[in-house]
Amino acid sequence: MERALGLPAEEDLFHKSLAASAKRMESAFRSPPGLDLSHPRDRQPSPLACYEAPEPEALLQPGVGGDPLALPPGSVCVKYGESASRSSVAESSGGEQSPDDDSDGRCELLLRGAGGDPRDASPAAGGGGGGGGGGGGGPGGGGGGGLKAAEGGCSNGHGHGGSKKSKEQKALRLNINARERRRMHDLNDALDELRAVIPYAHSPSVRKLSKIATLLLAKNYILMQAQALEEMRRLVAYLNQGQAISAASLPSSAAAAAAAAAALHPALGAYEQAAGYPFSAGLPPATSCPEKCAIFNSVSSSLCKQCTEKP
């Protein structure tokens, strides 16, 4: 109701300031014949009116309500949400009006009346409310700080857990690497010992055998030793049995070759490549073990060890 009652005074002040600015612009611009500036009520206020410099006479006039310290009407330009006159008319009529197309809402006239305007108190009340809200937000802020502290503690706990897990993984990886390193050292030492006993050219000029070559050479050496051992077992078994093959069982050519070999060396007949290691007919038949050992005098003494041990 107070704002509705104060409408005529505000309109009079607005029109007075607009008339003063129109008189000042009359000297620079001539009005066309069809334009009448004597009735400013029919014109819409220009949004640039607040940026125009007021006349000296208007500045020297006392403020509204006779207050010499108050600013004259039309000299204050602020950013206001809606025009004062438009809001007053909308409140008094009980309806809403659409804003003008040429007004951008950035600069409006703030008219101060002699009495206290309720709109002047609204920012203060809003400020007080904001202050109260800020005061009320204090405990909430404290709660937010406590929540942040709790989150920080949780993150720190996760960080410590992650660091402990990473340390355990690092220690496990170091143990695995050390065990693998020891295993490779043991394997290299074993291969070096195997190279030392395998009969192959050992000299600084010979390239060191690789692991695969060392294993292949050891395999061939073992097979060769097994074959030699099998042949030696056959010879020892024949010597123990005391069997002799007569010359009639051999062909004439084979008998002649065996006789010639026996004439050169008595021990060559024992290593003929015939089944059962037959002896040549040129050798006298030996029935006892000492006689056999006397015939094969070139064979190692280990073959006739059992003959020497007998009484």
UniProtKB/Swiss-Prot annotation:
One of its GO terms (molecular function) is protein dimerization activity. Gene3D superfamilies: Helix-loop-helix DNA-binding domain. Residues 22-170 are annotated as: Disordered. Its main location: nucleus. CDD domains: bHLH_TS_bHLHe22_bHLHb5. PROSITE patterns: BHLH. Residues 171-225 form the bHLH domain. InterPro entries: bHLH_dom, bHLH_transcription_factors, HLH_DNA-bd_sf. GO terms for cellular component: nucleus. One of its GO terms (biological process) is axon development. Residues 125-147 have a biased composition (Gly residues). Residues 81-96 have a biased composition (Low complexity). It is found in: Nucleus. Keywords: Nucleus, Repressor, Transcription, Transcription regulation. May act as a transcriptional repressor. PANTHER family: BASIC HELIX-LOOP-HELIX PROTEIN NEUROGENIN-RELATED, CLASS E BASIC HELIX-LOOP-HELIX PROTEIN 22. This is Class E basic helix-loop-helix protein 22.
